[in-house]
Structures are given as structure tokens and as C-alpha cells.
Regions:
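Domain-level signature for proteins that mediate thiol-based redox and metal-cofactor handling
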Residues: 2-111
Length: 111
């Protein structure tokens, strides 16, 4: 953010929040993109975003359980999303996701 150091914290937070809302909208529209592929290639998925939303809420004293956070991210109940849009994972997808989870742990210094 070297070139943008003149942006105050409140404005930066508003910009980041708007970008996050746009990401959620995009993911809700792209139901063809499976969570396992997001996780395998990008190291995160809609469930990760849900966990991060719940963690951020808790850090600010807001009670938000896992199901509510998932509904926030998915735009519908998680079970409804899975039944409408989730397809069975292939062995290749599972292997890629497992490797990505291991990479996440290594990057965070957990393994």
C-alpha cells in the first residue's frame, strides 16, 4: 500500500468492505465453481470465508454461529446450497485440496 498511504483507515475499511461484498456477490453468481476447486487452487473456499466472517464478528463482540455465517456468505442456507450446486468430488480434486490444505498449514507455520 505504499502509494496509497494517504488513505485513512476508515476509507480503507470501506473500500475493503465493498470489495468483499463484491466477492460474495461474484461467488453467489458463480455456483458452477465448486468449493473444492476454490480450495484446491486458491487455498480458500466459501466455507473459509464463512469462518473468517464468524471470527471477525466474534472479535467485535457479535454472536454469529457457523450456520449464520455460512448463510451470510452463500446467500442461502448451506444445506440448500449443497443440494442445489455441489457436485461429487473427484479423486483429483480431493488430492489437490489435500495438498492445498497442507500448503496453507506450511505457510502459517503450522506444519
Amino acid at each position: 500500500m505504499d502509494k496509497n498511504t494517504h488513505i485513512d483507515t476508515a476509507t480503507r475499511d470501506a473500500i475493503e468492505a465493498a470489495a468483499f461484498r463484491h466477492l460474495l456477490q461474484h461467488l453467489r453468481q458463480r455456483t458452477d465453481v465448486q468449493n473444492i476447486d476454490l480450495m484446491g487452487w486458491g487455498g480458500f473456499c466459501r466455507n473459509c470465508l464463512s469462518d473468517w466472517v464468524a471470527e471477525a464478528a466474534t472479535a467485535r463482540g457479535v454472536a454469529l454461529d457457523r450456520e449464520a455465517a455460512r448463510q451470510w456468505v452463500y446467500g442461502m442456507r448451506y444445506d440448500d446450497y449443497k443440494s442445489r450446486h455441489q457436485t461429487p468430488a473427484t479423486p483429483e480434486q480431493m488430492a489437490r485440496m489435500d495438498a492445498s490444505v497442507a500448503r496453507n498449514k506450511a505457510v502459517r507455520g503450522e506444519g
